[in-house]
């Protein structure tokens, strides 16, 4: 194993790292609610990027 660590220690660390990553992700989603207004954000971006199909590209200098 890496750095002379036993399989047991390696798997224990891996499990703890995975659990803390999941707990942190869940905490972010419960506290900040990043997906709550996702639909509104997507609609705003779609409306702000709509282009007139008859528009001509700018002329280069």
UniProtKB/Swiss-Prot annotation:
Cross-referenced Pfam families: DUF4516 (PF14990)
Single GO MF descriptor: protein-containing complex binding
Topological domain ranges for the Mitochondrial intermembrane compartment: 33-61
Disruption phenotype: Adult lethal, mainly due to flies becoming stuck in the food medium post eclosion. Rare escaper adult flies have slow motor activity, reduced climbing ability and short scutellar bristles. Larval motor neurons and adult photoreceptors have a reduced ability to maintain a synaptic response upon repeated stimulation. Impaired mitochondrial function in larvae.
Intervals, Mitochondrial matrix compartment: 1-9
Chief place where the protein resides: mitochondrion
Topology within the bilayer: Single-pass membrane protein
Tissue expression from the record: Expressed in the brain.
Any GO CC annotation of this UniProt entry: mitochondrial inner membrane
Ranges annotated as spanning the membrane: 10-32
Record's miscellaneous remark: Expressed from one of two small open reading frames (smORFs) encoded by a bicistronic transcript. The ORF for sloth1 has a non-canonical Kozak sequence while the ORF for sloth2 has a classical optimal Kozak sequence. Both ORFs are expressed because ribosomes occasionally fail to initiate translation of sloth1 and continue scanning to initiate translation of sloth2, a process known as 'leaky scanning'. The 'sloth' peptides were named for the slow movement phenotype of mutant flies.
Function as written in the Swiss-Prot or TrEMBL entry: Required for the assembly and stability of the mitochondrial ubiquinol-cytochrome c reductase complex (complex III (CIII) or cytochrome b-c1 complex), a multisubunit transmembrane complex that is part of the mitochondrial electron transport chain (ETC) which drives oxidative phosphorylation.
Family: Belongs to the UQCC6 family.
Protein name, as recorded: Ubiquinol-cytochrome c reductase complex assembly factor 6
Annotated source species: Drosophila melanogaster (Fruit fly)
Gene: sloth2
């Amino acid at each position: 194993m890496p750095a002379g660590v036993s399989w047991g220690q390696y798997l224990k660390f891996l499990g703890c790292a995975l659990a803390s990553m999941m707990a942190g992700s869940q905490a972010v989603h419960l506290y900040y609610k990043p997906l709550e207004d996702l639909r509104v954000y997507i609609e705003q971006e779609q409306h702000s990027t709509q282009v007139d199909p008859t528009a001509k590209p700018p002329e280069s200098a």
